[in-house]
Design a protein with these regions (language model features):
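Alpha-helix boundary/N-cap detector
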Residues: 1-12, 35, 63, 67, ...
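Charge-rich, solvent-exposed alpha-helical interaction surfaces
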Residues: 12, 16, 43, 71, ...
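Charged low-complexity interaction tracts in eukaryotic proteins
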Residues: 67-109, 150, 154, 158-161, ...
Length: 192
């Protein structure tokens, strides 16, 4: 029987919900989070197409995926409720019910760094140097690299931080700062 570890998926879902709550505030409502197929393949160590991934997540298909789907729902439902998954092409939607959003709000610690980052980049005139200073305030092990792809200006990340493994990519647009964060494997897929 195939065995998958849902910890990375669950952690990613919780991290995105926390980030959304830092940006918009907490509301007890449904949330739909979208992931490309490549991210799911990274989470599960697979290399399957969209339809097979849907079968894996549903517990149907050529192989007996029923235990896999049951394991996913068991792993996620105690915290996030009954997560529904659908896809259109290579884009997967994870529908988190209100009780899952409430669980994250009530039972996880606020990510202070994300809250401060969201507040900082919302400030008119925020600079890359201010962003870098925020990173160094939270850790002495920070890396920064320029990006020369025309889409983003700089990538900053915490080195060897299991709690925050993301690459944060920033773009200065006049007086505004935008950012995207990626898990390292997803970042590599984008070939920045």
């Amino acid at each position: 029987m195939l065995q998958y570890n849902y910890d990375n998926l669950q952690r990613s879902l919780v991290d995105v919900i926390k980030e959304e709550q830092a940006k918009l505030g907490y509301y007890r409502e449904d949330i739909r989070l979208y992931y490309p197929l490549s991210s799911l393949n990274h989470f599960f160590g697979t290399n399957v197409g969209a339809d097979e991934m849907q079968r894996i997540l549903d517990g149907t298909g050529e192989q007996d995926h029923t235990p896999i789907a049951a394991a996913m729902n068991e792993a996620l439902s105690d915290k996030l409720g009954m997560v529904e998954v659908s896809h259109r092409g290579d884009r997967f939607c994870f529908h988190i019910p209100p009780e899952g959003v409430e669980y994250v709000h009530e039972n996880t610690t606020e990510n202070e760094f994300i809250r401060e980052l969201v507040q900082l980049v919302a400030k008119h005139g925020c600079t890359i140097e201010e962003v870098y200073q925020l990173f160094t305030k939270h850790s002495g092990h920070v890396r920064r690299e320029p990006m020369e792809n025309g889409e983003l200006d700089v990538r900053i990340w915490f080195e060897d931080d299991a709690e925050d493994p993301y690459y944060y990519c920033f773009k200065q647009e006049e007086e505004h700062m935008i950012y995207h964060r990626f898990l390292p494997a997803d970042y590599e897929d984008f070939e920045f």
